[in-house]
Amino acid sequence: GVGKHGTFNVEVAVKDGAIERINVLDARETQGMGDVAMEEISKLIVDNQTLNVDGVSGATLSSGAFINAVGDALTQAGADVSEWKTRAHAGMSDAEDIPTEADVVVVGGGGAGFAAAITAANAGKKVVLLEKLGILGGDTSLSGGEMAVPGNWIQLKQGVKDSPETLAEDMLKGGDNVGDPELVKVIAEGTLDSSQWLTFEGGVSWEHDLLFFGGHSVMRSIIPQGHTGSEMIVKLTKRAGEIENLTIVKNMRATELVKDASGAVAGVKAESQLSGDAHEFKAKAVVLACGGFGSNVDMRVKYNADMDDKILSTDSVGAQGDGLTMASAIGAELIDMQYIQTYPTCDPETGALLYVDDMRLESRAIMVNKEGDRFVEELDRRDVLSNAIKSQTGGMGYMLWNQAAADETGLLKQHADEYDNLEKRGIIVKADTLEEAAAHFEIDADELKKTVERWNQFAKDGKDTDFNYRADLFTIDAGPYYLNSYKPAVHYTMGGLHITTNAEVLDESGAAIPGLYAAGEVAGHKMGTNRLGSCSMADIYTFGRIAGDQAANFVG
């Protein structure tokens, strides 16, 4: 089959015309997402002996590809696949014992939701976490998971001087000083503790390296093992499963916040995405951690007309702004909604964030245009890069690096699945010469050679006089060469619910709504006009933990 990240192989054991078991031999799907979908679908197929089964919401591509792969295996076994696909339908069903009362209900099963739920549960409260998709993780799983952490252990080992104050300055400057300095201070001062919480409470493992994200003044971003946020979600899911007073309910979309007679939030109305049944979850406090609205084109256009359907998105299909809709319906204030970020280097066909282009963040690649020229400083802010790319021929940019960079960083081996997929689709090319690489994308080869020669001279001189490259300069002086195309896609919505430093949601008069808290991308006014890379992880785990703690305190 062909899933989101390339091909995978399955083994189907058939006896007397029935499937006995399904084994996934080789899969490159996102850990905690595609693999979970395949496991659940396997059970449906084997238990019901049919290929007429539902996919898993949030992993639609992986689901369809897996079902097709099982069908291919059945064909090889001599079965009539068309007959298997017309057998009685088998769908997933709700759990039989869904708890409808809790001390704290958390809406959203991404990083912020897990941080809030685990924190509140560890405080002794009964917690129910609702996730509308059939898989957990949201945008956290789809991200690289890198986390801005001043004073981290790698900085200390490498002698990098940094501080929470410096991170706060970078974040405020990176968002044109629109973000709330007090909220930014909370993130900057809390992210080191949050990274340690992930390590010791969550069991998250880290690479022994840092990335230099655009807009930061120093290299400070730690990297989860595997260079993916799914490392965090898989480990947090495991930890949550060990806590007796924490229940996770998937395929349950929260639709409405419930208030009691005093005006305090006292629960959530929800709808099963499987059965359509209505549920009400009574609670003494609610934490909204259900992400932004990057996948909701109508909401994007409502607040920023430029962000229409011509622009693809890196976000989870679940990023629909549900929390904003529910909270604003009871008077919560929305703030900074017009500020929508695009990530500069995304798959031009699907909008997916390109992990191989982290070569730029490893300070080993340059960005060029159709004319073969550099057009921006590669480590500038995301909005600066995106706007620069949009103004190039075809609204497209191209990333260039060489084999030495690939070998030294190990990035292509780390993301071999993505690389293979991109190569098959012609989005990336490996060539022995610059001329050959340029020809693949019809880039001006002579100008590209001049650009590389000029860049190599900058590296020797120690100064980029064109765009003032901020990291250590490097040469691209020998092949093979790699070149890939990319364009910006919607990645993050800076606007959201107005919150206090205690994660309390404010109403339009500026008063806190009793019993309602928010954390992560659903909460706004932290990033200003633009978010610096790796600050989202710092935010979601810091404010997620605060929201869980404050909700537990409110319950008493």
Where do the PLM segments sit?
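Helical element adjacent to the flavin cofactor pocket in flavoenzyme catalytic cores
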Residues: 224-284, 324, 328-330
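Helix-rich C-terminal "cap"/substrate-channel and partner-interaction subdomain
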Residues: 44-47, 52, 394-482, 550, ...
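Glycine-rich loop(s) and the adjacent beta-strand/alpha-helix scaffold that form part
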Residues: 274-277, 281-347, 546
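An anion/pyrophosphate-binding glycine-rich loop and adjacent beta-alpha core
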Residues: 324-326, 332-443
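Active-site- and interface-proximal helix/loop "cap" or "latch" segments in soluble metabolic
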Residues: 1-88
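N-terminal Rossmann-like FAD-binding beta1-loop-alpha1 element of flavoenzymes
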Residues: 99-129, 552
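Conserved N-terminal/central alpha/beta ligand/cofactor-binding core
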Residues: 126, 135-247, 251-254, 365-374, ...
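A glycine-rich dinucleotide-binding beta-alpha-beta segment and adjacent secondary-structure elements
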Residues: 256, 447-530
